[in-house]
Amino acid sequence: MSIHPMNIQQPVEILLVEDNPGDVRLTREALQGSAISTRLSVVGDGAEALDFLHRRGPHAGAPRPHLILLDLNLPNKTGLQVLAELKAHADFRRIPVVVLTCSEAADDIAQAYDLHANCYIAKPVDYGKFLHVMGVTQQFWIETVKLPPA
Protein backbone atom coordinates (compact mmCIF):
# COMPACT_ATOMS: atom_id res chain seq x y z
CA MET A 1 0.00 0.00 0.00
CA SER A 2 1.40 3.39 -0.88
CA ILE A 3 0.81 6.48 1.18
CA HIS A 4 -1.03 9.16 -0.75
CA PRO A 5 -3.57 11.79 0.31
CA MET A 6 -6.36 10.16 -1.68
CA ASN A 7 -6.00 6.63 -0.28
CA ILE A 8 -4.43 7.00 3.13
CA GLN A 9 -5.80 4.52 5.62
CA GLN A 10 -3.46 5.18 8.54
CA PRO A 11 -1.33 7.98 9.95
CA VAL A 12 2.03 8.57 8.31
CA GLU A 13 4.61 7.38 10.83
CA ILE A 14 7.51 9.83 11.13
CA LEU A 15 10.62 9.24 13.21
CA LEU A 16 12.35 12.44 14.30
CA VAL A 17 15.93 11.89 15.46
CA GLU A 18 16.70 15.14 17.27
CA ASP A 19 18.39 15.99 20.57
CA ASN A 20 17.33 19.65 20.77
CA PRO A 21 13.98 20.01 22.62
CA GLY A 22 13.31 23.35 20.92
CA ASP A 23 13.68 21.83 17.46
CA VAL A 24 11.44 18.92 18.50
CA ARG A 25 8.76 21.41 19.58
CA LEU A 26 9.05 23.40 16.34
CA THR A 27 8.84 20.24 14.24
CA ARG A 28 5.72 19.10 16.13
CA GLU A 29 4.12 22.51 15.55
CA ALA A 30 4.95 22.44 11.85
CA LEU A 31 3.55 18.94 11.33
CA GLN A 32 0.26 19.75 13.05
CA GLY A 33 -0.85 21.67 9.99
CA SER A 34 -0.63 18.68 7.66
CA ALA A 35 -3.68 17.75 5.60
CA ILE A 36 -2.75 14.13 6.29
CA SER A 37 -2.71 12.46 9.68
CA THR A 38 0.83 12.03 10.98
CA ARG A 39 2.22 10.37 14.08
CA LEU A 40 5.60 11.68 15.24
CA SER A 41 7.93 9.51 17.30
CA VAL A 42 10.99 11.24 18.74
CA VAL A 43 14.33 9.83 19.84
CA GLY A 44 17.15 11.96 21.20
CA ASP A 45 20.32 10.26 20.01
CA GLY A 46 21.75 8.08 17.27
CA ALA A 47 21.97 4.88 19.30
CA GLU A 48 18.35 5.25 20.38
CA ALA A 49 17.32 5.77 16.75
CA LEU A 50 18.80 2.39 15.85
CA ASP A 51 17.14 0.76 18.88
CA PHE A 52 13.82 2.27 17.75
CA LEU A 53 14.19 0.94 14.22
CA HIS A 54 15.32 -2.50 15.37
CA ARG A 55 12.57 -2.47 18.04
CA ARG A 56 14.98 -3.16 20.87
CA GLY A 57 14.57 -2.50 24.58
CA PRO A 58 11.95 0.14 25.40
CA HIS A 59 11.18 0.45 21.67
CA ALA A 60 10.05 -3.18 21.25
CA GLY A 61 6.60 -2.03 20.12
CA ALA A 62 7.77 0.91 18.02
CA PRO A 63 5.99 1.56 14.72
CA ARG A 64 7.98 1.26 11.52
CA PRO A 65 8.38 4.79 10.15
CA HIS A 66 7.38 5.83 6.64
CA LEU A 67 9.82 8.77 6.87
CA ILE A 68 12.84 9.66 9.02
CA LEU A 69 13.88 13.24 9.85
CA LEU A 70 17.51 12.98 10.95
CA ASP A 71 19.74 15.54 12.66
CA LEU A 72 23.48 15.06 12.11
CA ASN A 73 24.80 16.43 15.41
CA LEU A 74 23.67 13.75 17.84
CA PRO A 75 25.09 12.15 20.97
CA ASN A 76 26.23 8.50 21.05
CA LYS A 77 26.13 8.01 17.27
CA THR A 78 26.20 10.83 14.75
CA GLY A 79 23.49 11.24 12.18
CA LEU A 80 25.94 10.17 9.48
CA GLN A 81 26.67 6.95 11.38
CA VAL A 82 22.94 6.29 11.74
CA LEU A 83 22.39 7.01 8.05
CA ALA A 84 25.18 4.62 7.03
CA GLU A 85 23.70 1.82 9.15
CA LEU A 86 20.17 2.46 7.88
CA LYS A 87 21.06 2.45 4.22
CA ALA A 88 23.25 -0.66 4.62
CA HIS A 89 20.39 -2.64 6.18
CA ALA A 90 17.94 -4.32 3.78
CA ASP A 91 14.97 -3.72 6.10
CA PHE A 92 15.54 0.04 6.31
CA ARG A 93 17.19 1.22 3.10
CA ARG A 94 13.89 2.12 1.41
CA ILE A 95 12.73 4.37 4.23
CA PRO A 96 13.28 7.93 3.00
CA VAL A 97 15.67 9.91 5.18
CA VAL A 98 15.51 13.68 5.24
CA VAL A 99 18.61 15.12 6.88
CA LEU A 100 17.39 18.11 8.89
CA THR A 101 20.36 19.78 10.55
CA CYS A 102 22.03 23.09 11.37
CA SER A 103 25.16 22.19 9.41
CA GLU A 104 25.70 23.84 6.05
CA ALA A 105 29.20 22.35 5.73
CA ALA A 106 29.92 21.09 2.23
CA ASP A 107 31.54 17.94 3.66
CA ASP A 108 28.42 17.08 5.68
CA ILE A 109 26.19 17.60 2.65
CA ALA A 110 28.42 15.48 0.41
CA GLN A 111 28.74 12.71 3.00
CA ALA A 112 24.98 12.62 3.58
CA TYR A 113 24.28 12.20 -0.13
CA ASP A 114 27.13 9.68 -0.47
CA LEU A 115 25.34 7.67 2.22
CA HIS A 116 22.09 7.90 0.21
CA ALA A 117 20.19 10.55 2.15
CA ASN A 118 17.06 11.37 0.17
CA CYS A 119 17.21 15.06 0.98
CA TYR A 120 19.41 17.50 2.94
CA ILE A 121 17.87 20.55 4.60
CA ALA A 122 19.79 23.13 6.63
CA LYS A 123 17.48 24.23 9.45
CA PRO A 124 16.71 27.94 9.29
CA VAL A 125 17.23 29.71 12.62
CA ASP A 126 14.31 32.07 11.99
CA TYR A 127 11.04 30.66 13.38
CA GLY A 128 8.91 31.70 10.41
CA LYS A 129 11.40 30.34 7.90
CA PHE A 130 11.66 27.06 9.84
CA LEU A 131 7.87 26.65 9.74
CA HIS A 132 7.88 27.44 6.02
CA VAL A 133 10.64 24.91 5.28
CA MET A 134 8.85 22.25 7.33
CA GLY A 135 5.59 23.05 5.56
CA VAL A 136 7.20 22.60 2.15
CA THR A 137 8.93 19.44 3.37
CA GLN A 138 5.72 17.92 4.65
CA GLN A 139 3.82 18.93 1.52
CA PHE A 140 6.37 17.10 -0.61
CA TRP A 141 7.25 14.06 1.55
CA ILE A 142 3.85 13.48 3.16
CA GLU A 143 1.23 14.89 0.82
CA THR A 144 2.81 14.39 -2.62
CA VAL A 145 5.32 11.54 -2.68
CA LYS A 146 4.23 7.92 -2.67
CA LEU A 147 6.14 6.35 0.20
CA PRO A 148 7.01 2.67 0.51
CA PRO A 149 4.82 0.70 2.92
CA ALA A 150 5.87 0.73 6.56
Residue map of PLM features:
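Negatively charged, flexible loop motifs adjacent to catalytic sites
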Residues: 20-23, 75, 91, 103-107
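Acidic catalytic/metal-coordinating carboxylates
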Residues: 45-48, 78-84
